[in-house]
């Protein structure tokens, strides 16, 4: 099965083009130079690609931290149409399944922590999840043959009771949202840690800060309310999910013994 994650739809974000196009061209030039035996030019092009990527990431991060405006309804509609267009092209290209990245924009709109809108996309739980459901419906209409996986970001708690992550839903709302996702046609859900705090320690906390595979209990609760598969890791601990990641080198051995 060919699987594609829709992360950056085809709308213009300054800096993304530089990362993809200019840096990509530099990498191609480096490979060509190396194939021709010109190590000096290969090194030069490699360093150029690294610099272009680093500079673009730095600008994007700075702009996201300091110059973020509330998206207009027109902009949200444009993004939704672009995501649907990406899905349609993926289907035509032979892709079998896509994952909708439910963090970032969708997670921010779903989040009661980050979403301060006063229109139809803000306020109540129903309003905050409205856009994400619209995106899924648009994908289903544009690419009816695709299997849709949805990455569901859950805001969890630190040891001191503070929130870990912002761009997602708290546990109770996340479970309720999972049922809505199934109703609009999502075929599979991946339960993940919410982020969007600018701190990677939220998404990948230091060892010892949280129990190993701390999202598994939430994934289990999600699975209890939906009939579709819920993707998670280390499924041998619970036996409730038909899909899991290979989180240990002995996982294949466990599968063979279990079968």
Spans of features found by a protein language model:
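Flavin-dependent oxidoreductase catalytic cores
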Residues: 1-259
């Amino acid at each position: 099965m060919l699987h594609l994650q829709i992360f950056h739809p085809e709308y213009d974000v300054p800096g993304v083009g530089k990362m993809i196009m200019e840096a990509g061209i530099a990498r191609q030039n480096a490979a060509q130079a190396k194939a021709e035996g010109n190590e000096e030019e290969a090194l030069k092009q490699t360093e150029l690609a690294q610099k272009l990527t680093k500079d673009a990431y730095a600008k994007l991060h700075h702009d996201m931290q300091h110059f973020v405006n509330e998206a207009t309804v027109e902009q949200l509609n444009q993004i939704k149409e672009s995501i649907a267009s990406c899905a349609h092209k993926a289907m035509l290209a032979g892709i079998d399944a896509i994952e909708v990245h439910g963090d970032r924009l969708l997670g921010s709109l779903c989040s009661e922590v980050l979403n301060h809108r006063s229109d139809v996309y803000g306020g109540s739980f129903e309003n905050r999840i409205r856009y994400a459901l619209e995106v899924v419906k648009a994908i289903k209409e544009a690419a009816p043959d695709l299997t849709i996986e949805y990455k569901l970001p859950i805001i969890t708690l630190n040891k001191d009771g503070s929130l870990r992550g912002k761009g997602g839903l708290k546990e109770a709302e996340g479970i309720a949202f999972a049922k809505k996702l199934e109703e609009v046609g999502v075929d599979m859900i991946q339960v993940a840690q919410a982020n969007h705090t600018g701190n990677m320690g939220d998404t990948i906390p230091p060892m010892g800060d949280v129990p190993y595979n701390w999202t598994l209990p939430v994934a289990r609760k999600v699975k209890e309310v939906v009939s579709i598969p819920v993707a998670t890791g280390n499924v041998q601990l619970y036996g409730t999910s038909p899909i899991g990641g290979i989180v240990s080198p002995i996982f294949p051995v466990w599968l063979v013994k279990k079968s």
